[in-house]
Amino acid sequence: MAVKTADSRLEEQWRGILSVHARTMCEIDRVLHPHGLGASDFEVLDILAAETPAHGDQCRVQNIAGRVHLSQSALSRLIGRLEKDGLVRRSVCEEDRRGVWVALTEKGRALHAEVLPLQREVLARTLTSSPAR
């Protein structure tokens, strides 16, 4: 029987983390699909809901970019889709014309509130029943 080295244990732990992540993301996608959202869409809505609790509050896209695992261009496209669906509103930052503000619409807040329990239930189920090795 081969003796596990520190490197092989790290590899095994890493693969376990990736496996839990993949299963969790697939399950989140599955439960959100009937609501017209995917896991990345939800993450952006969730960040906006946390960062902009009051109606009319805005968040810089740059601040969202630092918290999601998407390229700047992928995030821009995702926000464009959310805007087209009426879930967010974009505007140019007056202080820095290169910056873009994004805000949840009422429709976006309502959808986020509706699907939040679904996403949290998936996290509770997958992260407590499948710990990384």
Predicted regions and their residues:
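C-terminal regulatory/oligomerization modules of transcriptional regulators
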Residues: 1-9, 55, 117, 130-133
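Charged, amphipathic alpha-helical coiled-coil/dimerization segments
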Residues: 25, 80-133
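N-terminal leader segment of winged-helix/HTH proteins
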Residues: 1-35, 85-87
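N-terminal helix-turn-helix DNA-binding core of bacterial DNA-binding proteins
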Residues: 26-71
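A cross-family signal for key residues in well-ordered alpha-helices
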Residues: 18, 46, 113
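Short, hydrophobic-biased segments on the C-terminal half of alpha helices
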Residues: 61, 79-80
